[in-house]
């Protein structure tokens, strides 16, 4: 899924990819070329589908991957936490302390998520999905298996975008605080006591 005008420049580099054009962009964050999460959720109509960040490498075999991700129970979602590595600095994989990069959703759970302006690649979208669905009693499963690898790089979003994401959450969920949200995600993903080594970028 790409914003209007982006597909023409991308298709020559990725001729086998089936691009879908959308007008739903990250205008709330001032990102007219980034797509809103809603544009992806609207495509989940025929069965469970995976939303995954574009810079994630899946390292497991097809058989192993589908063994876990190929099944989704009613009224539930599956989430995947990435592992960061740095081949450039020869740093081994380390489980990401914050953030979630992979979501397996059914058409039913996708419809439960309203369009609040959340945008792929901008802060809070990955925290918002489980926060909202948890309030609707959706069962959430988290995988921390070493299968989603990510080469570390500089952060692509700003402090202002972070503040916008948190403000969207607080405007829609009264009394929610940033520490409360962070604690919820840490407990949900079982990373409350995780200590990560510093990875150079």
Model-derived segments and spans:
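A structural signal for short, well-ordered beta-strand segments and their strand-loop junctions
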Residues: 1-2, 49-51, 77-80, 139-145
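Domain-length accessory/inserted modules outside core catalytic folds
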Residues: 32, 46, 61, 87-90, ...
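C-terminal catalytic/acceptor-binding lobe
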Residues: 119-201
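Conserved catalytic core of nucleotide-sugar-dependent glycosyltransferases
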Residues: 56-134, 192, 196
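Short amphipathic alpha-helical segments and helix-helix/interface helices
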Residues: 8-11, 41, 62-70, 129-130, ...
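Preference for well-ordered, secondary-structure-rich cores of eukaryotic proteins
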Residues: 1-6, 47-49, 56, 69, ...
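Short, solvent-exposed loop/turn segments at secondary-structure junctions
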Residues: 4-7, 25-26, 54-57, 83-86, ...
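Active-site-proximal specificity loops/subdomain of glycosyltransferases
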Residues: 2-52
């Amino acid at each position: 899924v790409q914003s209007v005008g982006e597909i023409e420049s991308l298709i020559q580099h990725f001729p086998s990819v089936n691009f879908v054009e959308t007008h739903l962009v990250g205008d709330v964050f001032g990102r007219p070329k980034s797509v809103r999460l809603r544009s992806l959720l609207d495509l989940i109509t025929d069965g469970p589908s995976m939303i995954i960040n574009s810079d994630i490498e899946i390292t497991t075999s097809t058989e192993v991957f589908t063994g876990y991700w190929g099944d989704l129970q009613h009224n539930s979602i599956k989430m995947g936490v990435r592992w960061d590595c740095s081949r450039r600095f020869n740093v081994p994989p380390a489980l990401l302390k914050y953030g979630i990069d992979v979501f397996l959703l059914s058409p039913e759970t996708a419809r439960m998520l309203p369009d609040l302006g959340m945008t792929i690649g901008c802060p809070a979208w990955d925290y918002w999905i489980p926060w909202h669905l948890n309030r609707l009693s959706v069962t959430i499963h988290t995988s921390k298996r070493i299968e989603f690898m990510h080469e570390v790089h500089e952060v692509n979003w700003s402090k202002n975008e972070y503040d916008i994401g948190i403000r969207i959450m607080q405007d829609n969920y009264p009394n929610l605080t940033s520490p409360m949200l962070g604690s919820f995600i840490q407990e949900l993903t079982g990373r409350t006591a995780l200590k990560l080594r510093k990875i150079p970028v």
